């Protein structure tokens, strides 16, 4: 019974959750339909055009900067799933390997896609044959030297024996002819035999020393040859790499990383070697990209999907879901076109330069913090512009309204009715300055200076994050990278372009799995900016103040007779044709003396 009750409660709770989710989705879809029906999207055509052009130029120049900055660094590839490469034959980096050079006197073919196994086997057999021939030659040379040394020693030993026999004969003759006293003075034959034995020992020691020196010299020569061969192999490699021994890396050029298949990328560890980094003037590309970003921000473009969604969270009524999605679509479209063109010019290197390996947390934190700060600055600038435009939408600082003076003279004194800068609006002396040919109020000068300060601060912050920390600050880069990879593998791989073959290729489970792996590996570059922008929008909402005063209105001549309910309407800036004179004067008073009624926002 308890189990049945528990299952019934679980089933009922799941149904309630599903109903709430379906209800929320239906309401959201209705809101989107209302937004599309109410808003005329044609008036946003110039905004969408600026989004496309700005995203295209920004991604293009920043991609060129990243490509040039990374091309001056040597990349190191390590095979992580192989213990001893020499025991299981040398491994070739997978991919399309096209080259015309010779490495260690080994000839290679240009196309390895067909008969790959036969080509690799022939390469390895040729290499092992050369090693075997070299070892046999060295052994034969050592044996020849040993034979020569032994023959020389044997000849010398025979000559010594002949000398010894001759010497013995001479001694016998001398013994027969000389006296007994002279025999004592002659040398003992035992001493002669001892001398011969010492001579033989010295000859054997010299022989062993010569052999040892010969072997050591040959070992040193072999080691030097191996080192020279490794150095030549590292320097002359263009498209293909033989793996080095354990704990050693194979250096390759950055273009070779593009030849690694996506399914085999987990088998390799891509590292950077900044020791060989050379000076270059590629920093100008980052400067131009950041300058373009600031210029299009000044024109009203966003050029960042994360910032667009932050505006949607800040003002969901103005930037609805449909409009925000349309903005982001044009941003992605411009970025993808720029990345494909950049890949045609410089190669698809950034597919792997932007792919994080074993530093996911570090990449996520860099993207999160940098995007949070940039979005905070952009939202602060947006709120400042919005507040200034609302306060000065009637442009009364340049043109004085005489009718308003007559309407407000019955309620307020001239001395108390002052503007934001605390000078009398009704003073006749102040009106003389409007008679000049060109007059700009101080608040407009202040607005322009603050605007320039915001833009410069955004420019240098963006330049710092891109140039120093090498962060993208934009999920559009990762999307452009993914679609550029698809372009290279699908569109450019085959000579004949067929649309139906592309759709069929996406039905492959292995390709879908590869794309999911690529997406997960580059996930910090996607989630970090979105999290940073959302956190910035939430942070600013904590300091947001209510700019509208809501009061209850009793049914008067403002409303028609059929409206019998009490309603809450905003009193400020409520332009209605049925308002009475008191409400008009009250609204005008609050509009021109907003500092007495409203607190200024923090940002």
From Swiss-Prot:
Belongs to the MIP/aquaporin (TC 1.A.8) family. The chain crosses the membrane at residues 40-70, 282-299, 321-346, 360-393, 442-471, 509-542. It is found in: Endomembrane system. This is Aquaporin-2. It catalyses: H2O(in) = H2O(out); glycerol(in) = glycerol(out). It comes from the Eukaryota. Pfam families: MIP. The gene is AQP2. One of its GO terms (cellular component) is endomembrane system. InterPro entries: Aquaporin-like (IPR023271), Aquaporin_transptr (IPR034294), MIP (IPR000425). The keyword Signal does not apply. Keywords: Membrane, Transmembrane, Transmembrane helix. Required for sporozoite development in the mosquito vector. Residues 135-200 are annotated as: Disordered. Aquaporins contain two tandem repeats each containing three membrane-spanning domains and a pore-forming loop. One of the two canonical Asn-Pro-Ala (NPA) motifs in the pore region, which are highly conserved in aquaporin water channels, is changed to Asn-Pro-Met (NPM). One of its GO terms (molecular function) is water channel activity. One of its GO terms (biological process) is development of symbiont in host. Residues 191-200 have a biased composition (Polar residues). Disruption phenotype: Dramatic reduction in development of mature sporozoites in the mosquito vector with no impact on any of the preceding stages. Residues 135-149, 156-190 have a biased composition (Basic and acidic residues). It is a multi-pass membrane protein.
């Amino acid at each position: 019974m308890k189990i049945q009750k528990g299952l019934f409660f679980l089933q009922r709770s799941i149904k309630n959750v599903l109903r709430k989710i379906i209800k929320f989705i239906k309401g959201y879809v209705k809101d989107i339909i209302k937004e599309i029906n109410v808003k005329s999207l044609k008036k946003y055509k110039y905004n969408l055009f600026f989004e496309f052009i700005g995203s295209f130029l920004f991604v293009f120049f920043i991609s060129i900067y990243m490509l040039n900055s990374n091309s001056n660094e040597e990349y190191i590839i390590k095979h992580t799933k192989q213990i001893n490469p020499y025991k299981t034959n040398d491994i070739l980096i997978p991919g399309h390997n096209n080259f015309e050079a010779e490495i260690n006197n080994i000839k290679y073919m240009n196309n390895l896609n067909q008969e790959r196994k036969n080509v690799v086997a022939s390469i390895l057999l040729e290499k092992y044959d050369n090693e075997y021939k070299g070892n046999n030659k060295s052994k034969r040379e050592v044996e020849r030297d040993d034979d020569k040394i032994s023959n020389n020693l044997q000849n010398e030993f025979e000559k010594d024996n002949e000398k010894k026999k001759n010497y013995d004969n001479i001694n016998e003759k001398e013994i027969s002819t000389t006296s007994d006293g002279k025999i004592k003075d002659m040398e003992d034959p035992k001493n002669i035999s001892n001398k011969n034995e010492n001579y033989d020992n010295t000859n054997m020691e010299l022989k062993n020393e010569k052999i040892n020196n010969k072997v050591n010299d040959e070992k040193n020569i072999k080691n030097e040859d191996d080192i020279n061969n490794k150095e030549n192999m590292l320097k002359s490699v263009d498209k293909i790499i033989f793996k080095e021994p354990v704990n050693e890396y194979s250096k390759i050029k950055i273009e070779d990383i593009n030849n690694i298949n996506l399914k085999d990328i987990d088998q390799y560890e891509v590292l950077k070697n900044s020791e060989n980094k050379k000076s270059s003037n590629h920093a100008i590309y980052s400067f131009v990209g950041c300058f373009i970003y600031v210029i299009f921000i000044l024109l009203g473009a966003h050029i960042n999907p994360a910032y667009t969604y932050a505006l949607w969270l800040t003002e969901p009524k103005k930037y609805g879901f449909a409009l925000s999605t349309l903005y982001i679509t044009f941003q992605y479209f411009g970025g993808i076109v720029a990345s494909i063109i950049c890949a045609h010019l410089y190669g698809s290197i950034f597919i792997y330069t932007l792919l994080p390996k074993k530093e996911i947390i570090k990449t996520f934190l860099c993207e999160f913090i940098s995007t949070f700060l940039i979005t905070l600055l952009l939202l602060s600038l947006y709120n400042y512009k919005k507040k200034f435009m609302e306060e000065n939408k009637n442009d009364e600082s340049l043109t004085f309204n005489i009718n308003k003076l007559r309407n407000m003279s019955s309620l307020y004194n001239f001395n108390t009715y002052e503007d934001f800068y605390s000078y009398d609006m009704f003073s006749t002396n102040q009106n003389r300055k409007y008679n000049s040919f060109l007059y700009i109020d101080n608040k407009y000068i202040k607005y322009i200076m603050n605007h320039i300060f915001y833009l410069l601060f955004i420019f240098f912050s963006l330049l710092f994050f891109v140039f120093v920390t090498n962060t993208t600050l934009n999920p559009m880069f990762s999307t452009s990278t993914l679609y550029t990879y698809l372009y290279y593998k699908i569109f450019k791989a085959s000579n004949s372009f067929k649309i139906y073959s592309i759709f069929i290729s996406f039905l492959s489970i292995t390709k879908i799995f590869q794309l999911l792996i690529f997406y997960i590996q580059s996930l910090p570059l996607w989630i970090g900016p979105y999290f940073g922008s959302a956190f910035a929008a939430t942070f600013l909402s904590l300091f947001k103040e209510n700019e509208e005063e809501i009061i209850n209105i009793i049914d008067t001549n403002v409303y028609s007779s059929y409206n019998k309910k009490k309603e809450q309407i905003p009193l400020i800036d409520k332009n209605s044709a049925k308002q009475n004179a008191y409400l008009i004067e009250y609204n005008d008073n609050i509009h021109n003396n907003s500092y007495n009624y409203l607190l200024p926002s923090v940002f």
